[in-house]
Amino acid sequence: MTNSSTFCPVYRDLEPFTYFFYLVFLIGIIGSCFATWAFIQKNTNHRCVSIYLINLLTADFLLTLALPVKITVDLGVAPWKLRIFHCQVTACLIYINMYLSIIFLAFVSIDRCLQLTYSCKIYRIQEPGFAKMISAVVWLMVLLIMVPNMIIPIKDIKEKPNVGCMEFKSEFGRNWHLLTNFISIAIFFNFSAIILISNCLVIRQLYRNKDNENYPNVKRALISILLVTTGYIICFVPYHIVRIPYTLSQTEVISDCSTRISLFKAKEATLLLAVSNLCFDPILYYHLSKAFRLKITETFASHKESKAQKEKPRSENNA
C-alpha cells in the first residue's frame, strides 16, 4: 500500500451526509410499509407490471435494512465488528437494491411500451408466468454478481478510525470488486438504453393520440412515463458518472490525495441520490399500479367520511 493511500484522509467528514440518509430512510420505510399494505389489501390480478413492482418493493426492503447500519458507521459510533459487517454485507445490499431497481424499472418500461404502442398484441414478455420467471432470473443474476463480495475472506487489520472497505479486501477480493463494478456499469448502460428507448417510443405514441377523445387516460399515461424517466435520471445517472473515476481511485490508478477525497465525496453525494429512489418508488406505485391507487383513494375517502360523520353531530347540536 502506498503512502498516499495510507495517509490520505479519504473516509472522514461523513456526518453531514448521514442526516440526509436518515431522512431518506424514514420517508422510504414509511412509503414501503404503506405500499406493502396496499398490495396485500388489494388483489393485483398478477399483471406483469404488478409483479415487477412487487419485486422492486422487495428490493427496497433490502435497502431499508442496510441504511441504518451505514448511517451508524458513517457517524463514527459503530463498533469495529459492525464496521466490518457493513463492509462485508450491508454495503453490498445497497448495490443489490440499486441494480435490481434499475433492471425492474427497465421491465416496467418495456411492459408499458408494449401495452401502449402494441395494445392489439400480447407478447410472451407480457405473460405473468414469464414475468415471474424473468424476475427469478434477475434476482439470481444480481446475487451471483454481488454475493461473492460478502463471502470472499477479508484481511485481519488493526482497528483504526476512518478505515475504508477496500482496506479489508484481499487481492482476490479487490479484483472481484473491480470486476463487479464494471459489470454493474455495463448493466446500468444497457438497461438505461432500454428504459430511454421504451419511454421515447411511448411518448411518441401518446403524442400522436393527444387529440383523442380518451385524452385524460393519455395524459395520465404520459405523466407516469415522464415520472419514471425523470426519477431514473435524477437517481441513477449522477452516481454512474462518478463511479468509473471513483473506482479508479480505489485501485490507486488515481493516487492524488485531493482528487481521491473529492471523488469519494462526490460518490457519497450521488449515492445519496441513488438511494433516494426509496422515496420515489411509492409515487411510482401510485401511477403504475391500479390496486395501489385504489387503496390510497379508498383510505383517504373513508378518512374524510369518518371525519364528516364526527363533525355532523356537532353542527346539529350547535343548531
Swiss-Prot record:
Subcellular location: Cell membrane
Entries under Pfam families matching the protein: 7tm_1 (PF00001)
Protein's name according to its UniProt entry: G-protein coupled receptor 171
Protein's UniProt keywords contain Oxidoreductase: no
Glycosylated residue positions: N3
GO biological process, any: adenylate cyclase-modulating G protein-coupled receptor signaling pathway
Function: G-protein coupled receptor for Big LEN, a 16-amino acid neuropeptide produced from the precursor protein, proSAAS (encoded by PCSK1N). Acts through a G(i)-alpha-mediated pathway in response to bigLEN. Big LEN-GPR171 system plays an important role in regulating feeding and metabolism. Also plays a role in modulating fear and anxiety-like behaviors in the basolateral amygdala. Big LEN-GPR171 modulates the mu-type opioid receptor signaling and antinociception. Acts as a negative regulator T cell function.
